Amino acid sequence: MNRTPSLHTKEKKGFIDMHTMWKGSISFGLVNIPIKLYAATEDKDIKLRSLHKEDHAPIKYEKVCTNCEKTLSPDEIVKGYEYVKGKYVVLTDEDLKSLKQEHEEKAVEIVDFVQLQEIDPIYFNRSYFVGPGDNGTKAYTLLREALRSTGKIGIANMTIRSKQQLAILRVYENCIVMESIHYPDEVRSAAQVPGVPDQSNVNDKELQTAITLIDELTAKFEPEKYEDTYRQALLQRVNDKLENKETAVTPDKAPPREDVIDLVSALQASIDRTRRPNRETPAAAPAQAAEPKGAGDKKQKTTRKKASGTS
């Protein structure tokens, strides 16, 4: 029986409350359309935390300087561009802030309209649902229906979170979708792939057999029938361990043992220091040479007696 955990996957069934991730506008000629952006996809990867094997407490990562090995706080860290190995151009917060203000126009500017088939999917990056902003419903509907009627998509420039990107605008179901796409210099050339043969070296029989197999496996695309079997198996394994009570609890924070050890060491060092003058060698204590011989012997015997009485 295939059982998949539901309580522990943090998934909500039914209506999903869309979180507005960006507000701005689409510039379409002289038309300005207020919009809101929403994430169109979500990461379903199962997040596994790294734990200390001995006590199952989560581990943490610290930002450490590779030179002085000092753990750094956020205000001690700056950004830098490595122009050659080990050499950097430092960019201050003021540098980055001024650049952000220059390019963060909160507008998606449509610059061209093209056919979707002209863009290879290798350029596609991330998808966003575009919803109408305040008082933008009519203009939004106009753009959507114009795109639907012409079968065209819009090519646009946009800036989100200080990053300028190229994007397309198209109709998906009854909604406008914006997809960020890569710039040409971000797409590597297929000619750089090693080992790819330049010419075909298959015979007609082999080719026809492969075509027949493709024809037999050809079907209508139904995304619902494709599943992440590894994720399901991992969830099942987690569920089995929960049912068998194979769980671990993060322990309470351990006391700072090193501080205690250091304190004991400091106290012991203090005790040793108080005893050290009584244990000096005769050569290191010339001041006692002026004392009468009997007084020195008597004092030494008294000290030994006290030491033996307290041991």
UniProtKB/Swiss-Prot annotation:
Residues covered by region (Disordered): 269-311
Compartments where located: Spore core
Subunit and partners: Homodimer. Interacts with LigD.
Any GO MF annotation of the entry: double-stranded DNA binding
Regions annotated as coiled coil: none
Loss of function: phenotype: Stationary-phase cells lacking this gene are more sensitive to ionizing radiation. Growth rate, ultraviolet light and methyl-methanesulfonate sensitivities are unaffected. The spores formed are significantly more sensitive to dry heat, high vacuum-induced desiccation, X-rays and UV radiation, but no difference in hydrogen peroxide resistance exists.
One of the GO biological process terms: DNA recombination
UniProt organism field: Bacillus subtilis (strain 168)
Protein family according to the UniProt entry: Belongs to the prokaryotic Ku family.
Biased segments, Basic residues type: 301-311
UniProt xrefs under NCBIfam families: Ku_bact (TIGR02772)
Composition bias type Low complexity, residue spans: 282-293
SUPFAM superfamilies tied to this protein: SPOC domain-like
InterPro entries reported for this sequence: Ku70/Ku80_beta-barrel_dom (IPR006164), Prok_Ku (IPR009187), SPOC-like_C_dom_sf (IPR016194)
Chain ranges of the Ku domain: 26-210
Identification of the protein by name: Non-homologous end joining protein Ku
Primary location group: other
Alphabetic keyword roster: DNA damage, DNA recombination, DNA repair, DNA-binding
Induction: Transcriptionally regulated by SpoVT and sigma-G factor.
Its job: With LigD forms a non-homologous end joining (NHEJ) DNA repair enzyme, which repairs dsDNA breaks with reduced fidelity. Binds linear dsDNA with 5'- and 3'- overhangs but not closed circular dsDNA nor ssDNA. Recruits and stimulates the ligase activity of LigD. Probably involved in DNA repair during spore germination.
Pfam family, one: Ku
